[in-house]
Amino acid sequence: MTLRSKMTKYIFVTGGVVSGLGKGVSAASIGNLLKHRGFKIFVLKLDPYLNIDPGVMSPYEHGEVYVTADGGETDLDLGHYERFIDVELSKDSNYTSGKIFSNLFTQERNGNFLGKTVQLIPHFTNEILNTIEKIATKHKPDFMIVEIGGTIGDIESNSFIYAMAELALAKPDRFFLVHVTYVIFLEASNEFKSKPTQVSINSLRSFGISPNLVLLRNSKMVPDNIVEKIAKKSVLNKDYVISVPDMKNIYEAPLYFESQNIAQIILSHFKIKDIEPDLSKWNKLVDSIKKPKAYKAKILMVGKYVEFLDAYKSIIEAFKVSSYEENIDLKMDWVDSSKLELTNLDEFLKGYDGVVILPGFGIRGWEQKVRIAQYTRENKIPTFGICLGFQAMSVAHARMKGIKNANSREFANDKNDETYILDLIQGKAKDKNLGGTLRLGNYTTTIKENTLAKKIYQKDQVIERHRHRYEINSKYIDLLEDEEFVFSGIWNEGKLAEICEVKNHPFYLGVQYHPEFTSRPLKPNPLFTSFLRVLIKNN
């Protein structure tokens, strides 16, 4: 079933009371159910902050930067969208106030406004609407899900809410609003309080707009009397006010939404006949999550931003979905590499089945990553390196080969005795700005025969997503390779090393790219799955 001959329908998702309610998972779950009904889905995240994109934001501020196939540096919610909906999104899927303002200022400098005073209303709000409509025209989805970041009442969100209200007024038959809000529970009095949710909905009404569907978030089910109270105060049918409790696993959300007839409510609003979705594969996924596991594995995640695990959100999800597929009870322990005690690694690593050396930027903890890469190689501990992890494994190998001061130019010091086996990618040396100057998005890697990488991928070429500025200096590739160590994946166009591995080792493989961005709940990336298989085989 498809609506491609019709105009795109817009489903907006907003949040109320507090942030971090799961708007992204809610939007992704709605997209999942509509996709399972045969509709074409596109998702847009509108973020009110003034950064052009999250590319140079601290992981502690924003979590991971999710990279799209076309090289967009975007919000981590896009990871939820791609994983839940199994759709490849693009740079068009994330716009910030900063990005929209930048476009607006360019137009102003070009004289497009004919000397008029440029204001938030109507010029900025018009630019928001133009952005939404251009994307809809370009991608031609049946449904375009638009998540607005932040919460209702935030000053920085007001222009987006105003623009949304304008769109609702202009296209009422193509507009649907889902409001995700938090219902407070007071432990002291053992009761739910609905007033903040009512205020949130009233704030929407002050813009001339009412939600079509309200999702009530809490760790537990919101009782019927509170649901009825909120529905009455919101002038909504009780069936359109739905309690959404915390779930043991986020992948249960689409099935819960289906049980609450959320897709039916949306389709009924647009006067579209519902069809029965085939959710058998998703049901099987959730069953695999819930069932008792046949195996156990424990891995050490060696990172840099471990105090805020959203910095590694896609890696965590990639390992989880692979563990579900392999029926493994997986435990991930996290350590800040800069705090590693290198003098007692024997004792520290005891009890771990494998080690993952994680991505990151900056010198803090770099030497410890190199040392642990050398230790796990020498002691035959299964090791998987991603991005900076690949670089640490390569530098460790170079030093083991006798290149005593092998290093990356990223971490150059004032000494003249270092050998930079990792250097700026050609063409990046002259870039003065940090933002948008990395090697980003999809690139094709050619895999060598008779290697672990070939055994894992079962392909001659693979396409994976990249986000880095430094690569193995091509003049050192032949020097570093030997009977034990091989660069098993190469980007032929620029002779860039993309995969390294060690023979005669249970598993010692690093990748310059980010395989976590192509892992899906129903199609796990084989690198994560293969790594876990080795762990349970060793056990």
UniProtKB/Swiss-Prot annotation:
Record keyword Cell wall biogenesis/degradation present: no
Pathway: Pyrimidine metabolism; CTP biosynthesis via de novo pathway; CTP from UDP: step 2/2
Binding residues annotated for CTP, in chain numbering: S19, D154, I155, E156, K193, S194, K195, P196, T197, Q198, K229
Chain sites annotated for binding Mg(2+): D77, E147
PROSITE patterns, sorted: GATASE_TYPE_1 (PS51273)
Known catalytic reactions: UTP + L-glutamine + ATP + H2O = CTP + L-glutamate + ADP + phosphate + 2 H(+); L-glutamine + H2O = L-glutamate + NH4(+); UTP + NH4(+) + ATP = CTP + ADP + phosphate + 2 H(+)
Quaternary structure and interacting proteins, as annotated: Homotetramer.
Note: CTPSs have evolved a hybrid strategy for distinguishing between UTP and CTP. The overlapping regions of the product feedback inhibitory and substrate sites recognize a common feature in both compounds, the triphosphate moiety. To differentiate isosteric substrate and product pyrimidine rings, an additional pocket far from the expected kinase/ligase catalytic site, specifically recognizes the cytosine and ribose portions of the product inhibitor.
Protein name according to UniProt: CTP synthase
Source organism of the structure: Mycoplasmopsis pulmonis (strain UAB CTIP) (Mycoplasma pulmonis)
Highest classification ranks of the organism: Bacteria, Bacillati, Mycoplasmatota, Mycoplasmoidales, Metamycoplasmataceae
Chain's gene name: pyrG
